[in-house]
């Protein structure tokens, strides 16, 4: 049930992400664009105001206490090193897949509109702490990107990488 509700939420977010990425590609007119995938921990996206929590509970058909329990479960002791960035994509690959879809669709759209521009998205997977994390996330990012490119009949090129931000990753 939770997976389906996440999928529905991501379907709603996809066009907004795609429009944002399209705007970046257009603003940079063919210059390199690095898109850093979702980095903040999930608790930064949940309501804190009682009225907003009540609205969310009503929309989800849950009690305020159930929503508060979910919110509390997302709180982290050390959010700077916790469940965010690459680790978030490991737990919820559908988020990174949605972002990949949005990036690639936006790039294909801008490339069609401006064939003289060099559109080559650079996708950054953030906060990698171990090569296994990067390999795991990169695999489904590449699969998603390649499927979108094939479906569109495009020859779009792209890169997937990371920035070493955590000492143990070096």
Task: Name these PLM-found stretches.
Residues 1-170:
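Conserved alpha/beta-domain cores
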